[in-house]
Amino acid sequence: MIAKKLVVLLALCAVANANPAQQTPPTTPSADPSDPRVAVAARIPGARVDELRATAIPGIYELTRGSEIVYVTADGKYALTGDLVELATNNNLTEEHRRELRVKAISAFPETEMLVFGPKDPKYTVTVFTDVDCPYCRKLHSQIAEYNRLGIRVRYLLYPRTGPNTTSWTKAEQVMCSADRNAALTRAKLGEELKTKPCADNPVAKSYALGQDFALEGTPAIVMADGEMLPGYVPPDVLAQHLKDGK
């Protein structure tokens, strides 16, 4: 996990040398040279920084990209990885913010660009990053009726783990370009060949980018309504109990 966060941090810095036209500017510091954000911005000019804010620790700032979080010193010289825990309450402040960021990002993703399988009156809704060719994603989907029976509404976001210009990516595009997307997903997960041609107007790149922002390390990845993320396959009854306990 530490190595993953360092990669994310290095990626933030590397953006400065990438295509400037596609960069998202960092949080704008004030003109006051005593503002610590000036030093941080100077260390990573042009990097994609979604948010830079002070923490409860003097001189330590929180830097976010997607739902990934690292900490930097006020002078911008040092970076810290790991979770910030408030010992008095045992609250994981980093994870709390990650969850907020995930909820915000998923809320902004149109449900019309997801694949939704759910009962008429669901008790819970989860968002699942899935790969057509992932064995455990296929196992999860083979039990979709049981998830639904337990009151769980599943919203899929396609995340081809192999990335663009691969067979899994093409299959994902074929699913999203089908007249009946849900049926196409089920057929694809059963290993059936889809005849649909990929279309230009599909959300696969968008859902993949969201998964990248969430620093997914595999699929399936199940995101709860409160932003908690469970990596890997979770059986229907176990997920239902987890959701019930979290209410």
Regions found by a protein language model. Name each.
Residues F117-P135, R153-Y156:
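Short active-site neighborhood of thiol/selenol oxidoreductases, capturing the structured segment around
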Residues F129-S142, G163:
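Conserved redox-active cysteine motifs that mediate thiol-disulfide chemistry
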Residues H97-T127:
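Glycine-rich adenosyl-nucleotide cofactor-binding module
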Residues F129-V132, L157-P160, A188, A225, ...:
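Active-site-proximal beta-strand/loop segments in catalytic clefts of secreted hydrolases
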Residues V49-E51, G59-T64, E68-Y71, D75-N90, ...:
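Thiol/selenol-based redox catalytic cores and closely related redox-interacting motifs
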Residues I2-L9, C13-K104:
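N-terminal targeting signals for export/organelle localization
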Residues D121-K123, H141-R161:
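Conserved helix-turn-beta segment immediately C-terminal to the redox Cys motif
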Residues A41, P45, K139, A145, ...:
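Sec-exported extracytoplasmic/periplasmic mature domains
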